[in-house]
């Protein structure tokens, strides 16, 4: 399996405003049972010291199919829970800004949520997986391209390290 990583960072500040902006709901989770599906063995304080010229490998263990299934299932479930708490349906969402890990994961999540791909902000092809920076970068691009309008209902979706996941619904 090949992983395409990019480099980037971003931050989003939330502040009080007189507009109709609203944070409807936010859901987070962590799966403690699939830890061995994605591991970096022999790293940090447990790392054996070796000469890097010996071709030392950190020992990443990645079960792609398990991670794929779990990411899709987790993001779809969290989206459903956040939308339910917000009192909204998926049809009322104007944009989805997901973590840009893998296009197949995003397509499968959209299909499972019955959400049109044309309403998803995708920039993975330009930057790769920028880890925690992917959502702020995609949001910035959506704002610059005028895809986010006042009162847009946005669903943010994430899945990542530690097999964590999150979904947040906002009125921009």
Question: Where in this protein do the model-derived segments appear?
Answer:
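Claisen-condensing/thiolase-fold acyl-transfer catalytic domains that form or cleave C-C bonds
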Residues: 72, 76, 83, 94-172
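Short helix-to-loop capping/linker segments positioned immediately adjacent to catalytic or ligand/cofactor-binding
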Residues: 67, 82-86
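Short, surface-exposed connector motifs at secondary-structure boundaries
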Residues: 87-92
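Condensing-enzyme catalytic core mediating Claisen C-C bond formation in acyl metabolism
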Residues: 1-69, 73, 77, 159, ...
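A broad "ordered helical/assembly scaffold" signature
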Residues: 29-33, 64, 93, 99, ...
């Amino acid at each position: 399996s090949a992983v395409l990583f990019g480099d980037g960072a971003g931050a989003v500040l939330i502040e009080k405003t007189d507009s109709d902006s609203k944070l409807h709901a936010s859901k987070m989770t962590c799966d403690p049972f699939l830890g061995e599906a994605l591991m970096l063995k022999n790293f940090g304080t447990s790392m054996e010291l070796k000469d890097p010229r010996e071709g030392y490998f950190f020992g990443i263990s990645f079960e792609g199919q398990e991670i794929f299934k779990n990411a899709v299932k987790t993001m779809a479930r969290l989206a459903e829970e956040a939308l339910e708490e917000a009192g909204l349906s998926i049809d009322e969402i104007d944009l989805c800004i997901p973590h840009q890990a893998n296009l197949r994961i995003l397509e499968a999540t959209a299909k499972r949520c019955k959400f049109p791909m044309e309403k998803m902000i995708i920039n993975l092809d330009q930057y790769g997986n920028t880890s925690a920076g992917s959502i702020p970068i995609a949001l910035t691009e959506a704002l610059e391209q005028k895809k986010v309008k006042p009162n847009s209902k946005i669903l943010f979706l994430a899945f990542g390290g530690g097999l964590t996941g999150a979904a947040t619904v906002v009125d921009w």
